[in-house]
Every structure is written in C-alpha cells, then in structure tokens.
Amino acid sequence: MGSFSIWHWLIVLVIVALVFGTKKIGSMGTDVGKAVKGFKDGMKGEDDKPAAQNAAPSQVADKGTVDVEVKEKSNS
C-alpha cells in the first residue's frame, strides 16, 4: 500500500485528462514552458547588464584635463 504501481498512475492520469481535458492540460504545459523560458532569460539578462555597465569608458575627461603632448606639439 506504500507505493503505487504504474497502473495506479495511469488511472489517475486518465481521470485528470477526463476532468480537465487534454486541451487545458496542453495549455497549462505551454504556460509552464513559457514561464521557465522567461525565468531563464531573466537570469541571463541579469548577467549581461553588469557587463554592459562595466564597459563604460575608463578615461573620463573633464574641462580641466589638459593633454600635455598636444600642448607641447602646438608650441613647437
């Protein structure tokens, strides 16, 4: 009585199919698949966003920054 055989599970599956209908079960499977795919894409997007933010230019020039080489060449 502790474990169910394959026949018990087949009977349960047939009853569930009769109650909900195969179309409803198929649409639930599709919805679950879309949810899993959306979750995976969301997790993949989390990894991509910090890499894009870190790709900012490493040198930031402000108005007070002077390029010495350019200044020396213009004086020569």
UniProtKB/Swiss-Prot annotation:
One of its GO terms (molecular function) is protein transmembrane transporter activity. Residues 39-76 are annotated as: Disordered. GO terms for cellular component: TAT protein transport complex. Gene3D superfamilies: 1.20.5.3310. It is found in: Cell inner membrane. InterPro entries: TatA/B/E, TatA/E. Residues 39-50, 64-76 have a biased composition (Basic and acidic residues). It is a single-pass membrane protein. Disulfide bonds: none annotated. The chain crosses the membrane at residues 1-21. GO terms for biological process: protein transport by the Tat complex. Keywords: Cell inner membrane, Cell membrane, Membrane, Protein transport, Translocation, Transmembrane, Transmembrane helix, Transport. Pfam families: TatA_B_E. PANTHER family: SEC-INDEPENDENT PROTEIN TRANSLOCASE PROTEIN TATA. Belongs to the TatA/E family. The Tat system comprises two distinct complexes: a TatABC complex, containing multiple copies of TatA, TatB and TatC subunits, and a separate TatA complex, containing only TatA subunits. Substrates initially bind to the TatABC complex, which probably triggers association of the separate TatA complex to form the active translocon. Part of the twin-arginine translocation (Tat) system that transports large folded proteins containing a characteristic twin-arginine motif in their signal peptide across membranes. TatA could form the protein-conducting channel of the Tat system. This is Sec-independent protein translocase protein TatA. It comes from Herminiimonas arsenicoxydans.
